[in-house]
Amino acid sequence: MRRALIFLASPHFFAPNFFIFIYAKRISTPQIPLFIRPQGFFQTNPKVASQLYATVQQWVKILPINHLWDLFCGVGGFGLHCAKALQDQGKPVTLTGIEISAAAIESATQSAQKLALNNVTFASLDAAQFALKDRQQTPELVIVNPPRRGIGKDLAEFLNQLNIPYLIYSSCNAESMVKDFAYLTHYQLHRVQLFDMFPHTTHYETVTLLIRK
């Protein structure tokens, strides 16, 4: 059984530093607190989002990785779930989360502190520009959850060149995802799962695991 609770109201109702707190309790996954501010991004369906994060967490925890990037990270849902699972296994984990929204980064940092995660950094930057410029340490896994437009040709080709063993790609727009897959020529699709994130609409969330050829 998975549960999530969220309270929403007009942003004008809240004091500047007020935050909304989501507590998602899940069987077989750690308890991950996620904080949302009015201008931060979070999945529109918290119940399905908890299943989405738990699925990726299960995929990642068996991979031989220690260093990961979470690009377009929002409030850090994907990266925090994965880092917590890996750290609980005794692995030395380094997580870098990148998101353009400063409010979302504040929330992600707060969650990391609550979880007492070490070697976790969240920064308010353009995800594509960060990836193209940061060559100091190459991760073993990159997670991308881009806007509907996708990651685009430049970032996809950069990921090809970066020689990363694993990619997690989550998208609410299968058409842009397919276009990006055409650019990701060094990777092959290994796992895929759909989530009914938007009931009673034609939209859905797709998460995939890609492995370097």
UniProtKB/Swiss-Prot annotation:
Record's signal peptide: none
Biological processes per GO annotation: rRNA base methylation
Transmembrane segments: none
UniProt keywords, alphabetically: Methyltransferase, rRNA processing, S-adenosyl-L-methionine, Transferase
Single GO molecular function: rRNA (uridine-C5-)-methyltransferase activity
E.C. no: 2.1.1.189
Lyase listed as a keyword: no
InterPro entries: MeTrfase_TrmA_AS (IPR030390), MeTrfase_TrmA_CS (IPR030391), SAM-dependent_MTases_sf (IPR029063), U5_MeTrfase_fam (IPR010280)
Pfam families: tRNA_U5-meth_tr
Catalytic activity: uridine(747) in 23S rRNA + S-adenosyl-L-methionine = 5-methyluridine(747) in 23S rRNA + S-adenosyl-L-homocysteine + H(+)
Gene3D superfamilies found in the cross-reference section: Vaccinia Virus protein VP39
UniProt-annotated catalytic positions: 172 (nucleophile)
Residues the entry annotates as binding S-adenosyl-L-methionine: 43, 72, 99, 145
Function summary: Catalyzes the formation of 5-methyl-uridine at position 747 (m5U747) in 23S rRNA.
Family that this chain belongs to: Belongs to the class I-like SAM-binding methyltransferase superfamily. RNA M5U methyltransferase family. RlmC subfamily.
Protein name as it appears in the record: Putative 23S rRNA (uracil(747)-C(5))-methyltransferase RlmC
